[in-house]
């Protein structure tokens, strides 16, 4: 097989880049390739390159690894471009959580919709379009753009509709949900089949089969409620399953902020979440986790570099889609997964222009979606509410229309359940001003927003949220990890 080039944008996301790298190299036909890493951080690039070089050296592979802060150079001649960028980093992300809290909006993640996710999209989309321009101009003709960056639907929408690049959005929510269902049903490998369909982070297990037998709502509810862990961690998802009749792929914390019912009253939030891990609903949970992960990696880098010398065959291939898509496209070995693409009738009762997440098959001919899926009415209604917000958000990001941006936030299900229009208008002004350096399309609107804030009349409060935890120190994390090892050892 002829060699080709894979470019990873945002390769400074060190743990994820390493995972993608080892996944791809687990396929023998994909080892004689070049990985071109690019990131704004020279420091992070140097760390990840040293780790990947160590893997190549230890396993005597023909793989080449290059690293540069010059994105266009990294994309030259690339056949596949993978994006895992976080525009604004943790600094901007902290504002996505902090400012909405002043107006009563308590988010667990804030990276998909809700106030935080919408502003995240405003930061990302101009950069995504820059990526697409480079791909069109310097990548291999017909190059495929694999987007892992959130907000998934908005970024993918912009790349397809405005970037004019062959794009697929990838997420692992479906796989994680399927693992839960397999566990509660006692299914072994190969015994569970399922169809998930919807939009990213609001995808639904519309058909679940165990050894060919269809598993219904009542059986799933009983199995989840009988599970000693999931019955506590997934209370909100189980409640939605009872009412909608199907299980959501997304985590308890994620799902809680896409719906208008479970996070709107501070005194009721604790009823639906679980604090055993951030992903089950903790206020600003993913921000805390991301901050701790960054700090932990910086401290533990020497150990991570040493571990990179392990034989490749001892590293388990993850369930991320990227390596399997590349394997299917390059070798013809068919892969079935769930992908984010423009709808165009794949799901019959969602808008044609929406970015949907649904089953598809990949081979040498490309990604071929399974068409004609109809969602249960409640699932479709929930998804359509989010699609409408996504559409307005994308259009606002493209045009720099701050009034349309405010309307998008106003129509968000959770924000709309909590805030008045006056509160939304002021909140968006505050967020745009705080993040101005990452929002070039709103440069013309910043001064007016500052003037409005100077005479603001809407009262706010400094609120940490209903279920906030402080960022742990390196010493605290190390102690907890050691304690966990001792517990596991019995």
Curated annotation (Swiss-Prot):
The question of whether Ribosomal protein is a record keyword is answered with no
- Record's catalysed reaction(s): Hydrolysis of terminal, non-reducing alpha-D-galactose residues in alpha-D-galactosides, including galactose oligosaccharides, galactomannans and galactolipids
Known cofactor(s): Mn(2+); NAD(+)
Q: Which residues bind Mn(2+)?
A: 171, 201
Alphabetized SUPFAM superfamilies for the sequence = LDH C-terminal domain-like, NAD(P)-binding Rossmann-fold domains
Q: Where does substrate bind?
A: 150
Q: Quote the InterPro entries the UniProt record gives.
A: GH4_Enzyme_sf, GlycHydrolase_4_CS, Glyco_hydro_4, Glyco_hydro_4_C, Lactate_DH/Glyco_Ohase_4_C, NAD(P)-bd_dom_sf
Detail which positions bind NAD(+): 4-70
Give one GO biological process term: carbohydrate metabolic process
Residues of the active site are: 172 (proton donor), 258 (proton acceptor)
Domain of life (superkingdom):
Bacteria
Name the NCBIfam families for this protein. PRK15076.1
Protein name, please? Alpha-galactosidase
């Amino acid at each position: 097989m002829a060699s080709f080039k894979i470019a990873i944008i945002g390769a400074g996301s060190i743990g994820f880049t390493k995972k993608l790298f080892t996944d791809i190299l687990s396929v023998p036909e994909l080892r004689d390739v070049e990985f071109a890493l690019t990131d704004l951080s020279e420091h992070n690039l140097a760390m990840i390159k040293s780790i990947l070089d160590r893997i190549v050296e230890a396993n005597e592979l023909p793989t080449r690894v290059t690293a540069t802060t010059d994105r266009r150079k990294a994309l030259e001649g690339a056949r596949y471009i993978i994006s895992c960028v976080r525009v604004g980093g943790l600094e901007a992300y902290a504002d996505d959580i902090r400012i909405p809290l002043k107006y009563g909006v308590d988010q667990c993640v804030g990276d998909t919709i809700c106030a935080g996710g919408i502003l995240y999209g405003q930061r990302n989309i101009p950069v995504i379009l820059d990526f697409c321009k480079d791909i069109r101009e310097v990548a291999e003709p017909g190059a495929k753009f694999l987007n892992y960056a959130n907000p998934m639907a908005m970024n993918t929408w912009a790349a397809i509709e405005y970037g004019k690049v062959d794009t697929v959005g990838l997420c692992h929510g479906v796989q994680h949900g399927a693992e839960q269902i397999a566990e509660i049903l006692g299914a072994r490998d190969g015994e569970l089949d399922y169809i998930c369909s919807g939009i990213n982070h609001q995808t639904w297990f519309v058909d679940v089969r165990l050894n060919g037998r269809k598993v219904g709502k009542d059986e799933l509810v009983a199995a989840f409620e009988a599970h000693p862990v999931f019955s506590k961690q997934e209370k909100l998802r189980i409640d939605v399953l009872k009412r909608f009749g199907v299980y959501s792929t997304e985590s308890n914390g994620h799902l809680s902020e896409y719906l208008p019912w479970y996070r709107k009253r501070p005194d009721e939030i604790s009823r639906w979440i679980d604090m055993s891990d951030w992903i089950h609903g903790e206020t600003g949970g993913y921000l805390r986790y991301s901050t701790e992960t960054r700090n932990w990696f910086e401290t533990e880098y020497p150990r991570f570099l040493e571990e990179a010398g392990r034989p490749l065959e001892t590293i388990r291939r993850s369930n991320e889609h990227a390596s399997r898509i590349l394997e299917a496209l390059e070798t013809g070995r068919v892969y079935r997964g769930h992908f984010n693409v423009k709808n165009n009738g794949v799901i019959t009762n969602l808008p044609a222009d929406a970015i949907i997440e649904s089953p598809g098959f990949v081979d040498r001919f490309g990604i071929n979606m399974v068409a004609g899926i109809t969602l249960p009415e409640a699932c479709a209604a929930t998804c359509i509410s989010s699609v409408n917000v996504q559409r307005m958000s994308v259009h606002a990001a493209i045009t720099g229309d701050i009034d349309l941006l405010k309307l998008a936030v106003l129509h968000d299900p959770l924000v709309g359940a909590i805030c008045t229009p006056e509160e939304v208008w002021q909140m968006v002004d505050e967020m745009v001003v705080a993040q101005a350096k990452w929002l070039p399309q709103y440069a013309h609107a910043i001064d007016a927003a500052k003037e409005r804030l100077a005479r603001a009349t809407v009262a706010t409060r400094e609120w940490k949220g209903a279920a906030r935890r402080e960022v742990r120190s390196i010493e605290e994390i190390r102690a907890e990890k050691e304690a966990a090892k001792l517990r596991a050892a019995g």
